[in-house]
Amino acid sequence: MRRTMQLFRIQLFNLFPIHEIREPGNRKKRAAVILSIGGTAAALFLCAYNILTAGALAEAGEGALIPAYMVSISSFAVLFLTMFRACGILFGTRDMDLLASLPVKNSEIIGSKFLLMYLMNLMISLIFMIPGGIVWIADVKTDLPLLALFLSAAFFVPLVPMCLVSAISLLIVLASSHFKNRNIVSLLLSFAALGLVGYIAVSSMHSEGDMGNVGAILAKQITGLYPLSGLFLKSAGGKTGVGLFIVLSTAVFSLFIKVTSANYCRLNARAGAGSKYSKRRFPLKKHTPFSALFRKELGRFFSSYTAVLNAGFGVLLLCVFSVLLLVLPPEQLGEYAGIENINGFLSDYAPVVVAALLSLSCPAASAVSLEGKNVWILQSAPVAIKTLIDSKLAVNILLHLFGYLPAVCSILIRLHMTALQIAGLLWIPVCYSVFIAVLGLFLNQRYPNYDWDSEGMVVKQSLPVIVAGIAGMVCVAAPVLLSWFLSVPLLSVLWITAGILTAAAAIMYHKLCCLNYL
């Protein structure tokens, strides 16, 4: 256990540069402060939302369902979010050769990696469980042993979803390693798994039943989303059900660690193996400096399973939204989303929806860090700094085009919009796209991380990626909130915001082009 904690401590310091931040005058300190403020604000927002949701259940006379509901929602959130980072933390890392040479067991290695992932998911679990528990205690009189079991169960909630997703992710990587186009197969299988998770969530939320028995319908929806949450229902026996949940979670976790550690070296080698097929050979051609750098950036992005899965997720959602809008009637989409006048809603909020999903995809925020220890090649290349910057931004803009064009076409075909709304749909998402791309590259240039063990650390958990994501969401939410609270037309606020973002992007782009080296 002592060596497991030592390995965990080392990985934690690699993930979060605590020692560098503590140094006086370090540039990462400002980014860490922004990240802390943004993370705290997001956590408080989720806590407030969970309190309101639990309060709604209590007002409906279904306060006994609060524990099961919070377990179900938090487990689903952990399951969904872990799918983006499981393999990047557990398997296929560059530090395996170093770890294998140390006098540690495989169980200690995978235990430390799993503990790192558990710590991040525990925060999600507590954000749901603690606010819901407060409302539950205030609404339902419960005995002290049951309350202690409920609070203890919060620490066991992430275990089963993490083990399940880790096993699925490993199977995807192992299955795709037998194919020539490994990354394409991995992405297809991963997106299929995400689609299945989304389908289960939607199906569970539309369970039919006797409308006179609201409690039975809610219980069916909760257990449909996450079956183990049924152990927290009163019908499961109270303390017996919660205790059984803790025992099952511990047993699943122990079994996963035992099975995985027995074959960890072989599984890790297989996860990092390349295709057995030889690569195709292409004739050498001359290209302009920009074209050559752009092709290199584009090839590196699409050759990285982790980068495409995470940085391309927003664009994928936008493409799925476009297909659904073309295939299904807008009224049916409104029924699924709980929106009565879907045509009027989308006509007003279409620029916000497109901009929000584009803001989720920002490969430029990790483009510099992904150069790794080979960054000296770019820094010493006889190429203008503006060309280097343009090539990295072009990949981000091209990725956004894959989602922007289908979304705009589908919205224009299916919805009836005024000329001003059409102009906003065409221009406002472009401003957001340019801003988020320039902001991501600007942050990554100021706070790079060239010494990484796994691409997942750079693509998903680095300061520039997280700060750019938070900034993008703030820029999307701010106009909507201003429109709601100040009773100002949304489109007018969006046009003003787009102008501000365009000016900010121009300033950051000018500063990047004035650099001596990347």
Residue ranges of each PLM-predicted region?
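Hydrophobic alpha-helical transmembrane segments of membrane proteins
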Residues: 1-96, 106-376, 385-518
